[in-house]
Amino acid sequence: AWSFVETQRIDAAFLASVCARAVAARGLFDLQSDGVRLIHGEADGLPGLIVDRYGDTLVAQFLSAGVERWKAAIADALLEATGLHKLYERSDASGREREGLKPVTGWLRGEGATEITIREHGWKLSLDIATGHKTGFYLDQRDSRQRFAELAQHRRFRRVLNCFCYTGGFTVAALAGLQA
């Protein structure tokens, strides 16, 4: 359910208000990053929708038939709420099949490079929104990368071997810590 109010009309105006509220809530935090999850599905009242911001680009996953139906209105609402102009769709998760939806990837609004550099804790991190896992980056590991840099700074380990590198975020964190 997108609303627990029986009389709530589900339309573009309603979706715009939900998107604007979620985007505004993320502005309350100083994340030391220009990579942030703006819409987290059910937690923001939009089940089946994931939206991440990477610099000046939004990346969205429309994972349910409900959000798929309202995709154009949601895309417009997101760009209005953020003031951005680019939205890349990564609706290629296998769960879409259960909803009778085919995988979709590509630019939904605007266009640009799919290889993006974001800033996190003063570091530059590269990702690819077209080929990366889900929307392109593990934003939820921001605090872990910062803690890893702190451990490196205090010389809690002598060497680091990153055998399972995805984007190099932990390697960058270790190097930043060792240089501090």
Task: Show the residue positions of the predicted features.
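Non-catalytic accessory regions of SAM-dependent methyltransferases
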Residues: A1-G55
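Short amphipathic alpha-helical segments
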Residues: D11-V18, G66, W70-I74
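Conserved SAM/SAH cofactor-binding pocket of Class I
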Residues: R145-A180
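Carbohydrate-binding surface patches
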Residues: T57-F62
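Conserved SAM-binding loop and adjacent beta-strand
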Residues: A130-A149, Q153
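Conserved hydrophobic/aromatic pocket- or pore-lining residues that grip, position, or stack substrates
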Residues: D56, L125, S144, F164
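Non-catalytic substrate-recognition/targeting regions of SAM-dependent transferases
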Residues: I39-D52, E68-F137
